[in-house]
Every structure is written in structure tokens, then in C-alpha cells.
Amino acid sequence: NSYKTAIDAFNAENNGKIALGGFEMTWSGGPGHINTFNTEGIVSRNNTALNNKTDDAGLKAYYALLSQPEGVDSLSQFNHPGSTFGTFSDFSYWDALIDSRMYMVEVGNGEGAIGAGGYYPSYEYYTMALDKGWHVAPTNNQDNHKGKWGNANDARDVILTDDFSEQGIYEAIRSHRMYATEDKNLEIYYTVNEQPLGSILEEIPEELSLSVQVSDPDRTDSISKVEVIVNSGRVAYAWDDPAELASGLLSCTLDPTYSYYYIRVTEGDGDMAVTAPVWVGETLKLGISSVVCGTSTPVTDEELTITTTLFNSESADATVKSVNYTSGGETLGVDAAGNTIPASGSLQIPF
């Protein structure tokens, strides 16, 4: 078809740029938007079956379409998750086959300057997708509607490959060799037990040896903190010593307690970057969906209710031993009632 032919012709020129062909499937007012790359053709959001928003029927139909043998070479991305465009029903409907078609999730989106209006970070949904079992790498894209293709702001996707070609880039994405950054020239290389970011350690080792190389060539930029993030967004380890950070060579050893480990880098000006995880063993698909305050405008010294929603996508019930609420390092309260989250269900705990 004409669009594939145009891409092939552009890439054949070998001019230092690579074109990747794809399309966006959208559900206006529905579960979300998805980019799909490397297919023989495209589909329309006006397709009656695919656009059916009743009980997410259209999203489920799209997952089924991608899961067909013809979709084996396709790569898809969860676009700008959040309250505006949708969270894919909090990343529901996971199964191993569709997981093998979804490779990325946006942690930032928009044409505005980083930290200003028109730029929409969504880092918490990256963690949610990982907690729900999806094997995805982070991206930070511009969603350009007004030109400035690629240079509207400093957000970048970084794909690690030694094969700078269309298929070489796709293979790197399939291996999740990626990180997303708000600083256009921040460099990160991350390994666990000498396996690079995006790897899956199927057998759980006795310990995890993490190594992080991080640098920014700009003299005005500095690294203020580097963290290891694990299930439910917990910080498992952090480096914040200025001298150690300035060396750009960081390492630590951790117990293999969690299902995934990714790196979060924060610069002195607030710019942030996150890497693809290294997964360890089988992902435990349970965690926190949301923490919501019942009062829209809280007032000091007035009582309010905080509701924590927990999910369990496993095939067996899960017991919550306790839920701890803290603020500024101070414990506000502990719910130790021993609640049970049903299999393939959720539980709300008010506090």
C-alpha cells in the first residue's frame, strides 16, 4: 500500500533518519487511545465493532484483532493514560497474548514545555500498568498537532540499538531497551545481574546486582537523585550523595523481593527520566489502583476520608495484612483489619 511504500522509500535513502509507520486507534469518551506500528494496513475508529464503548467491547475487540497471527509483528503503545482520555479501565483485560503485542506506555505527552501547560505527565500510570502485569517500556512523546515535529519540547524516547534501521528499532522496542526522559541528552544505561534494561530474569536469583550509568553533558545540568522503583511505586533504593552522583557510576545489591525494578532519575531542575524495568520471575498482579480523598477542598483540622482501592488480578484471594498512612514521614494511622481482596477483584478501604 502507498503508506508502506513511502516509508520504505524514505528509509532506503539512508539519510540519518528512520521513518516508522503507524496509526492511532481512539475511543472518544471511552477507555483510551492506542498507537499501533508495523502493520500492513490501518483500521478506523469509525469501525462499528471497534468503536463500541459499551463494557469496553471495542477495546476488547481491538485486543482480539492485535492478538491474531497477523498481528505478531505489530507493536502497540498505551497513549497518554489519565482521566482526560482514559486509563484502559485501569489497564484491565491482561492476558499473555495481548501482553506480547503491547510494548510501550506514555509517561508524558504534549506539545508544551516540560513542567508547563500543554505537557501532561502520567508516571503513576506506568507503575499501574506494570502492577497489572503488562510488560511495557516508558515513552515520553509530544503528540504534535501544530508542527514542530520532534522539537516542541525536550522530551525524548531513547531506544538502545546497534542496528539503526526500521527493523532494528522495532527489535529494540520488542526487547524493551528503552527509557523516557524530559531532558533531551540525558544518558542512562542500566543492568541487573549484567542483563540490560528490559530483560526478564525468568529464574529468581539469590540476589540482584544493579548497575546504573547516568550522565548529562550540559554543564548547567546536574543529577540530584537516582532511585530504584519497584511494585506499587515503592522506592527500594536511592542514591542522593552529590559526589557519588557526579561520578555517574552507581551500584547496589538487593534481595529479589519484587517483580520488577526500574530506574527513576531526577535532575536538579526537576526534569525526570524513567527506564524500562528488569523483570524478575513472574509478575505478581496485585497492588494499589488509587488513593482518593473524599473532600474536594480539604480544610486544616477538619476530618476527611481517604479511600484506598486495591486490586487483585491473580487467580486466588489475597490478604492485606495492613495499610499504613503516612505524611511527611509521620504515621497517621494503620488499618490492620486483615482485609481480603477476592481473586480477579478489588477492595476499597476507607480511612
Model-found features: residue ranges?
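Intrinsically disordered, low-complexity Pro/Gly/Ser/Thr-rich segments with frequent PxxP/GP/PP motifs
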Residues: 330-351
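Short, solvent-exposed loop/linker segments at the N-terminal edge
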Residues: 199-206, 293-302
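Exposed beta-strand face motif in extracellular beta-rich ectodomains
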Residues: 257-261, 304, 347
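Extracellular recognition modules
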Residues: 262-266, 309, 350
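Short beta-strand elements bearing conserved aromatic residues within extracellular beta-rich modules
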Residues: 225-228, 321-325
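Asparagine-centered strand-capping/turn motif at beta-strand->loop junctions
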Residues: 310-314
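Short acidic/proline- and small/hydrophobic-mixed sequence motifs that coincide with surface turns
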Residues: 221-224, 298-299, 315-320
